[in-house]
Amino acid sequence: MPVLNEEKLIEGSLQVLAGWPGLELIVVDGGSVDRTIRLAARYAKVITSPPGRAVQMNAGAREAGGEILWFVHVDTTLPPDAPNQVRAAVAEGFVGGAFSTRFDEPTPFWDLITCLDNHRTRIFHVYFGSRAIFVRADTFWEVGGFPEIPFLEDVAFSRKLRRAGRTVMLDAVALESFRRFRKSGPIRQLLLDMILLGAFELGVSPWFLARLYKDVR
């Protein structure tokens, strides 16, 4: 779990994960100045790294000893029995995948948006990190881990992963935080996300795009 100044959410998120047996919990802090590290240490192994989600997730992967790596964002709420669903998918031969999502503040309009996004994800196998990406550890290292770019590392990683083998979007639904949309304005944020993703797919530098993407903490 990559974190930076997440004292409001870290404890609740880790309490859920700690309640599931058989998980090795690793929190990678990118330089928090609040109580994030102290709270996380009650439930997980905490390491530090330079800031940057890709850098932090790669650092956590190097510390992990399991056969499956599972990258969970602090503001993603996982469905019941999520670990067993991940294990079952890998046992079926998938090299990785992620969960379906909906927002944690649903409305008919935003349910439609997430339904369309789930459909896109199922077709193209491009997973955002808010979907709690999982991957076989050996496959993760074969493809070189997350590209250490400042933005859309999850999309770039998905491209590499789908070339390595079969991936799956699970039907089980994880709740994605609406906080980014609430802070920036829902429609404005939706349009910005679409523009930034389209620009990235056209080859615009992720370093340039990262400057346009606001931190919501």
Predicted features and spans:
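Acidic helix N-cap motif at the loop->helix transition within catalytic regions
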Residues: 8-12, 34-42
